[in-house]
């Protein structure tokens, strides 16, 4: 048995045993050690290792370290085990045997391999900069035995462990339904609804998370021309390695209404399941292929039958919905510790639904075109009727007649409003008698290409070119509703910062005079993967599509020997390549105090610096840095100076976004200069819609340095609005960069650094955002060498 990944500390001790504790005012200081500390770069290294089929085929059984730590993750692997706790590597000294056995430190895996494969597996892990070592052995004796410091501290029979402990009993009483819970009242107007917390936009929260990583997001969290219609599902391509393509995707959605669950846990949970599946249907999936997983969170139950009645009712409601839909829940999580002093959480059951789908069949929710009929698909109040309505909708979708769809969540009015936001396409109702503010469990609103012959439902109205929503006697402009909707949580999750002034559009028409004298039919690109890098696969895919052979070199820093070997391997690769591409990510976790410090320190190694300068100055090579890679190029001096040098206060740099948080969305960039081999296939004024994802992307420079860049044609790209005008508006310029600068060249154009992730593209990527997403940068680089 091999332990793989992170080291073990006191973080997480008590995580499982204390998962149902009630906290108090002292918990923050007395129970902090029970909280696990995540390490995303370490987890990603494990992902890289497990994508190697030759490695995973060595594994007979494996387990992730979760609740219970070693005692569970390893203890579950086989009936008989001898576990050596002294072998478990620690974050620090002082842990006793029990702490080593139950710590829930994160980013650890336990794997079982054949004895003859152990060294091979460990060597493969070390190639990915991971620690891996033997900690236990499988035995014939059906006992779990733990040793620590020469003592046997646990010796338990498997028969005893398999009993799962003593039988437990609880008394349950299902109370009266509390229809007044939270004082839920229907909204009276569109403006009131748009201003409510219930329907508020979560964009300021969502943009803190990378929505485009992996170049596999079929849907971005917000879509449409204005990126304002929220996606109800997460749709993603199955991950494949560079050189492979797929159109197979999965869609996942959730359902939960705390108000409904508080009023009636049974009905609330039932509706949560129905809503989660309805969202899949609205995205184009077949509900018959859906599976579920449930998460529950309830107040501390104590020994009170009334409290026990809430999860009892909720689980019964969820089970009934599963039986009606023939959709099974596989796995899940629960916690019964939602009480703090005299406060209790509302009964919470979240249903997550997932289904397979072809990426080209995914329906996006934003209205597409004016003049289209809009229908609501309604059952007859029974499960059979609901499924019939879904099947009717699905048939129209397969016939190509559905342009947009939304599963009704809070009200019909909310659905129409949010479908209108993305492209500012208006809506006008046809019937004044419709109750627009009622909820409709399982109902789906759809924009159709034509009037259907027959549907399980009713016509609601038509889309309009005028950006106004009219529901009977209630009417409001879309931009006003959107402003109200995004303003609800502005103080908590801000979306606005800086000014909205316009800046100059930079244009440098002159082409680069640089000529490649060392021609090759298929250039080679070296892609270093530093600790924290997360875009090397996407970058390699972009290279392959452009006719470039990528070589990913993993930089290992676990030991001094690994670091030295990595430097030698990278130097060798650079001297054999035609280009170096520094991919995006968060090298070293962007610590301490700023991004790309580890990359810069590593590349300042004299041998590596010499190899890079030889590539650029003597072998006609090229260099590209994207996002984290751009940060490294700037801090090394490769842009804008074209050489590795010591930087000072007179030099440009990249710093924290003006809004003070991570930004993830799509932006429009304009080609400002083509004075680089990287721009051979681009023209000044070309507009591209590409994703950004960074916390430190704000380009700043002293006024003289900025003026010199502009005067010498070194500003390659600018952030612009939909009409191609550079601006300081945060919706245009997401980080507040000086002169809306997105990318810059070295003086000869051989080195290009930019923030936007142009490599994150594909025919099924971000289908809910319009625009030209293919910037032929890699193709230009390949053309330069031919």
Where on the chain are the PLM-derived regions?
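Glycine/proline-enriched, intrinsically flexible loops and inter-domain linkers
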Residues: 1-588, 602-613, 744-745, 773, ...
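Short acidic/polar capping segments at secondary-structure boundaries
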Residues: 7-9, 116-117, 140, 381, ...
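Short glycine-/acidic-enriched loop or helix-start segments at secondary-structure transitions
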Residues: 12-13, 121, 341, 537, ...
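Short, basic, glycine/proline-bearing loop/turn elements
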Residues: 33, 303, 592-600, 717-718, ...
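Catalytic metal-binding/acid-base residues of hydrolase active sites
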Residues: 66, 335, 587, 629-631, ...
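General alpha-helical segment detector with a strong preference for membrane-spanning helices
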Residues: 68, 288, 411, 631-632, ...
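Amide-donor transfer/coupling interface in amidating biosynthetic enzymes
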Residues: 563-565, 569-570, 611-614, 646-786
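Cysteine-nucleophile active-site neighborhood
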Residues: 583, 587-675, 779
């Amino acid at each position: 048995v091999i332990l793989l990944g992170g080291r073990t500390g006191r973080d997480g001790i008590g995580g499982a045993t204390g998962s149902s504790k009630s906290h108090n005012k002292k918990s923050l200081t007395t129970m902090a050690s029970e909280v696990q500390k995540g390490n995303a770069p370490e987890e990603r290294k494990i992902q890289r290792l497990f994508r190697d089929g030759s490695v995973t085929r060595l594994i007979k059984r494996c387990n992730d370290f979760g609740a219970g730590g070693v005692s569970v993750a390893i203890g579950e692997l086989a009936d008989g085990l001898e576990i050596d706790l002294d072998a478990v590597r620690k974050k620090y000294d002082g842990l006793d045997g029990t702490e080593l056995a139950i710590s829930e430190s994160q980013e650890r895996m336990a794997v079982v391999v054949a004895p003859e494969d152990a060294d091979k597996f460990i060597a493969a892990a070390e190639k990915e900069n991971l620690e891996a070592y033997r900690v236990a052995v499988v035995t014939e004796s059906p006992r779990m035995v733990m040793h620590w410091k020469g003592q046997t501290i646990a010796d338990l029979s498997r028969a005893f462990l398999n009993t799962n402990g003593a039988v437990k009993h609880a008394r349950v009483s299902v109370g009266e339904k509390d229809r007044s819970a939270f004082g839920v009242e229907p909204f009276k107007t569109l403006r009131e609804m748009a201003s409510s917390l219930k329907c508020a936009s979560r964009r300021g929260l969502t943009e803190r998370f990378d929505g485009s990583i992996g170049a596999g997001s079929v849907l971005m969290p917000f879509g449409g021309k204005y990126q304002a219609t929220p996606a109800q599902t997460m749709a993603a391509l199955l991950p494949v390695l560079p050189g492979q393509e797929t159109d197979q995707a999965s869609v996942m959605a959730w359902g939960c209404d705390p108000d409904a669950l508080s009023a009636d846990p049974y009905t609330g949970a039932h509706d949560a399941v129905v809503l989660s599946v309805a969202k899949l249907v609205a995205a184009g999936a077949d509900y018959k292929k859906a599976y579920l997983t449930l998460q529950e969170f309830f107040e501390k139950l104590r020994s009170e039958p009334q409290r026990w009645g809430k999860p009892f009712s909720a689980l019964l409601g969820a089970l009934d919905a599963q039986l009606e839909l023939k959709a099974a829940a596989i796995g899940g999580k629960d916690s019964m510790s939602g009480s703090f002093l005299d406060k209790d959480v509302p009964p919470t059951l979240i249903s997550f639904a997932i289904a397979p789908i072809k990426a080209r069949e995914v329906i996006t929710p934003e209205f597409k075109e004016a003049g289209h009929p809009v229908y609501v698909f309604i059952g007859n109040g029974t499960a059979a009727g609901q499924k019939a309505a879904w099947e009717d909708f699905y048939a129209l979708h397969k016939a190509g007649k559905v342009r947009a769809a939304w599963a009704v969540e809070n009200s019909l009015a909310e659905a129409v409003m949010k479908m209108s936001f993305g492209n500012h396409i208006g809506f006008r109702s046809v019937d004044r008698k419709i109750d627009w503010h009622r909820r409709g469990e399982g109902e789906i609103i759809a924009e159709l290409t034509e009037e259907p012959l027959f549907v399980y439902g009713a016509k609601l109205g038509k889309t309009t070119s005028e950006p106004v929503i009219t529901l009977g006697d209630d009417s409001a402009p879309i931009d006003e509703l959107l402003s109200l909707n995004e303003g609800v949580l502005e103080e908590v999750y801000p979306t606005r910062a800086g000014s909205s002034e316009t800046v100059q559009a930079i244009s440098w028409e002159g082409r680069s005079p640089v000529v490649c004298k060392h021609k090759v039919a298929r250039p080679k690109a070296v892609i270093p993967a530093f600790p924290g890098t997360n875009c090397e696969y996407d970058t390699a895919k972009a290279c392959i599509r452009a006719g470039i052979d990528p070589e990913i070199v993993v930089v290992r820093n676990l030991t001094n020997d690994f670091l030295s070997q990595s430097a030698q391997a990278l130097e060798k690769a650079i001297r054999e390549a035609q280009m170096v591409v520094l991919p995006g990510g968060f090298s070293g976790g962007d610590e301490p105090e700023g991004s790309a410090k580890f990359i810069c320190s590593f590349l300042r190694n004299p041998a590596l610096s010499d190899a890079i300068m030889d590539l650029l100055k003597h072998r006609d090579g090229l260099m590209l840095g994207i996002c984290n890679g751009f940060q490294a190029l700037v801090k090394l001096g490769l842009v804008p100076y074209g050489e590795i040098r010591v930087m000072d206060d007179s030099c440009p740099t990249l710093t924290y976004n003006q809004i003070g948080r991570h930004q993830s969305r799509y932006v429009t960039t304009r080609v400002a200069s083509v004075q680089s081999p990287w721009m051979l296939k681009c023209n000044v004024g070309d507009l591209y819609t590409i994703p950004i994802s960074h916390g430190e992307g704000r380009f700043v420079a002293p006024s003289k340095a900025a003026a010199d860049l502009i005067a010498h044609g070194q500003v390659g790209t600018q952030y612009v609005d939909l009409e191609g005008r550079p601006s300081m508006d945060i919706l245009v310029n997401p980080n507040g960069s000086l002169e809306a600068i997105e990318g810059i060249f070295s003086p000869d154009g051989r080195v290009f650094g930019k923030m936007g992730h142009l490599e994150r593209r594909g025919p099924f990527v971000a289908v809910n955002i319009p625009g030209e997403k293919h910037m032929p940068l890699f193709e230009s680089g390949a053309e330069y060498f031919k």
